[in-house]
Amino acid sequence: IDKFLEIEEDKFIKKLEPVYKAINKVKNKIKKNQTLICFAGAPWTLLVYMLNKKSPAKNFNIDKMLKDEFLINLILKKLDSFICLHLEKQIQAGAEICQVFDSWAGIVPKNKLYNYCYIPNLKISNHLKAKKIPSIFFPKGLKYNYKTFANIVRPNCISIDSTINPTWARKSFNNIPIQGGFNPKSLLKSKSEITREVIKYLKTFKNYNYIFNLGHGVLPSTNPDKILHLIKTIRDF
């Protein structure tokens, strides 16, 4: 933590130069009609990894982590600044849209959501809007607080996890475009079941600005053929 608080912007950027070089290489390889998305973790999620040094376990002691409120606010403020800078650099390298992952938003205590989740993400959202950079935000695990997040942060697009009812999402976000939601576990089912569930999603979001995607990452045990089937089903709809 001390090392992070002492690091300066130029050293931070130098450390991440391989990321920007990789984006530039990819940009030069893809077709002109293909959009390149860059990403970063949200301040709260990065803070969780910094203090826990790994993915939080079921017995993760959130109260212990939140003891030093002054330190947390100090770290979040610096993370906000560095994340904005990192996203800008990725856009300069060739990316066209930014996605911000708040993968551990779901473990923020309810009385801390405003300060630790909504406001840090709002700062990033406002910064990107000022630079005319489109954004997608993914506050995983917020459940029905997703609506409050969307109303406060007002991203260009909001990504939903698999616990969110798609019908509820369509009615709740004041026409903000929606991405994701499809359960990765569904890809472990038969092709006919996958087809049925994909069609259900596509019908729910018909005539709505929707980007089909999973509600989280592909599970390691997923058969690649099922992914190809998923893509074909979407394209044939």
Question: Where are the regions that the model predicts?
Answer:
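A contiguous, low-structure linker/loop signature
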Residues: I1-D10, N33
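Active-site loop segments of alpha/beta catalytic cores
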Residues: K15-F237
